[in-house]
Each structure stands twice: as C-alpha cells, then as structure tokens.
C-alpha cells in the first residue's frame, strides 16, 4: 500500500483528496495535517465524510510516508518544506503554485515536474516531485495543446472561463459569501490571471515560436464546482481536420474526450474528466473545455500523477461518474 500524508487538510482540495483516496485500492491515508483542527475528526471540516472515515486531524507529520500532498495556500509550500523535512524516498505533490513555472521548479535539490499528464507523462513517471497545474490552466491547456502541436496557434486566443465558488478556497472573502455569489456573476484579474504563465510555458513546449496573446477573462460563477471555458481563435483547418488532430493527440489519454456536440458542465462535475467540444464558423474555431475545478483541476489530477509516479494505471481510483442532474 502507498502511505499518504495530506498537508493543509481543512480545505476543499484536501477534502476532495480524502474523498477519492479513501476508496483508492492501493492507498492508506496515514495522516491529515491541520494545525487549526488538530485532534478533531475530519468530519468537523469535511461534513460529507461523517460516518465514512474514523480519523482525526493531526499537527504531527510522519516524515517517512511514501507521498505527501501539499494543499496549502499559494506561496506557503516553500516555507512548509523549509521547516519540515521528509525522507529522501518521499514523493511530494504540490497543489499550490509555488513550483509550476520553470524559474521556480528547482528547490533545495528538488526538481519539480509540471504535472500535466497529457504532455509530461514520461517525466512524471520518473520524478519524485510534482507541481500540480492550476484549475483554469488545466482546462485551457487541454483545449489548446493539439493546436500547438500542429503549429496552428498563430493568432490571438480569446478565452472566457467561469469557475465555481470552491475555486476561491474555503476561507470567506467579500466575493465568496452566499448573499454576494448567489444569482450573480463577475470577472476578475482580466488579462493578468496568474495561470497565464504556466499555460504559455506549456504551449511553447509544443510550438516553440508561439508568441500570440492569450486574452483571458476569468469569471466567478454562482455554482460550487466546475469550470466552463470557451476559447476562440483563427484557424484554416476544417472541422473534420481539427477533430482528427484532437482525437489523435488524446487517443491515449483516458480522461479527455473530444466531441462536436454541445456540452454542459454537469457532464464532468465530481470526475477527473475533461470534455472538449469543437465548432467551426468560417476561419474561426470555437473550443469549449469543461472540467471539475476540484478534481481534474486539482485533487483528481494530483492522484492521477501519484498513480503514474508509483507505476499504477493512471485511472486507478479515478473511475468517477458525474451525477448529470
């Protein structure tokens, strides 16, 4: 069995990790670390776990676990790792943004690999250290990578993506209160969202002359989980040619489905799936990409990476079905 530790155990991504890992056939959850809830049952923070798992939060870490998931606020993983040493064999998967960019990937002798399996699977299998991608970054990259592979990203890309309230984290803020978020929408960080950097680096990895603008408008939705992203750009390929290229690119990727039908977010919520829909009008291509921000956009993808790191089928423990209604 793979002994797992979870750091920052009170948040949404940690709760999603626990929800999936408690049924993973190859995993034992060794500890869930939270200084604020130490000694209390996991169900104090994760009410959906009541009656399903008898385990308490702890303020002590086991440095000898096989893998540790860092579910800390952005910028906090570095300080945690400086203050807490793990065994040399312990694999680390960081769900924050501390190590995602190339310039940040090397830390105290550890080289973090960007954990997007659809382009970095071989490297993920060999590494002990993963920088898990951001949620928006995952949906957007999966929408664009086949175009980059064929050097078709030669014009500005217009991106509009809406995320659920869980994307803001468990701590309350002015824009996460029910009275503000319900029956409401707003955009934020227009043209300057922090995920743009990691998206750009992955696109250049496949299309080395990529220098077009990614004009990204992120939106806050009034639903709890999921990302619905629409992207459009110019492309001379026919719809049939594009579908063939996308299907070829993702033919060995079990969590990505390509279609030309209309799609809706409920098709992926609470799963590790990404569904991509293609539409063509003249020389414009519309790409719609949907994921669950907590699963494929965070915890599910982290488990997918863990599976690859330990030589398991990447789908192990991730055969999850959306409710659809």
Swiss-Prot record:
Main location: cytoplasm
PROSITE patterns tied to this protein: ARGC (PS01224)
Presence of the UniProt keyword Repeat in the record: no
Keyword terms, alphabetized: Amino-acid biosynthesis, Arginine biosynthesis, Cytoplasm, NADP, Oxidoreductase
Pathway: Amino-acid biosynthesis; L-arginine biosynthesis; N(2)-acetyl-L-ornithine from L-glutamate: step 3/4
Residue positions of the active site: 135
PANTHER family hit by this protein: N-ACETYL-GAMMA-GLUTAMYL-PHOSPHATE REDUCTASE, CHLOROPLASTIC-RELATED, N-ACETYL-GAMMA-GLUTAMYL-PHOSPHATE REDUCTASE, CHLOROPLASTIC-RELATED-RELATED
The protein's name: N-acetyl-gamma-glutamyl-phosphate reductase
């Amino acid at each position: 069995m793979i002994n797992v530790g979870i750091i920052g155990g009170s948040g949404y991504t940690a709760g999603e990790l626990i929800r999936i890992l408690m049924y993973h056939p190859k995993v034992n959850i060794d500890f869930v670390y939270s200084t604020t809830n130490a000694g209390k049952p996991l169900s104090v923070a994760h009410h959906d776990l009541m009656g399903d798992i008898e385990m308490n939060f702890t303020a002590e870490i086991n440095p000898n676990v096989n893998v540790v998931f860092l579910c800390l606020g952005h910028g906090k993983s570095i300080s945690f790792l400086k203050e807490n040493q793990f065994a040399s064999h312990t694999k680390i998967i960081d769900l924050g943004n501390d190590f995602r960019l190339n310039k940040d990937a090397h830390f105290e002798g550890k080289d973090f690999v960007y954990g997007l399996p659809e382009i970095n699977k071989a490297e993920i299998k060999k590494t002990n250290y993963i920088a898990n991608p951001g949620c928006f970054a995952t949906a957007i990259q999966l929408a664009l990578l086949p175009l980059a592979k064929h050097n078709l990203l030669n014009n500005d890309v217009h991106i509009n993506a809406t995320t659920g309230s869980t994307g803001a984290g468990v701590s309350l803020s002015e824009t996460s209160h029910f009275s503000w978020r319900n029956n409401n929408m707003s955009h934020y960080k227009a043209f300057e969202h922090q995920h743009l950097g990691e998206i750009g680096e992955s696109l250049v990895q496949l299309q080395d002359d990529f220098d077009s603008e990614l004009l990204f408008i992120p939106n806050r939705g009034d639903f709890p989980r999921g990302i619905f992203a629409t992207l459009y750009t110019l492309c001379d390929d026919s719809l049939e040619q594009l579908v063939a290229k996308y299907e070829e690119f993702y033919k060995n990727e079990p969590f990505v489905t390509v279609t030309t039908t209309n799609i809706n977010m409920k098709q992926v919520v609470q799963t590790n799936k990404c569904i991509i829909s293609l539409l063509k009008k003249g020389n414009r291509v519309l790409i719609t990409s949907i994921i669950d921000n907590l699963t494929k956009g965070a915890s599910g993808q982290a488990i997918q990476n863990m599976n690859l790191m330990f030589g398991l089928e990447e789908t192990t423990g991730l055969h999850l079905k959306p409710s659809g209604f």
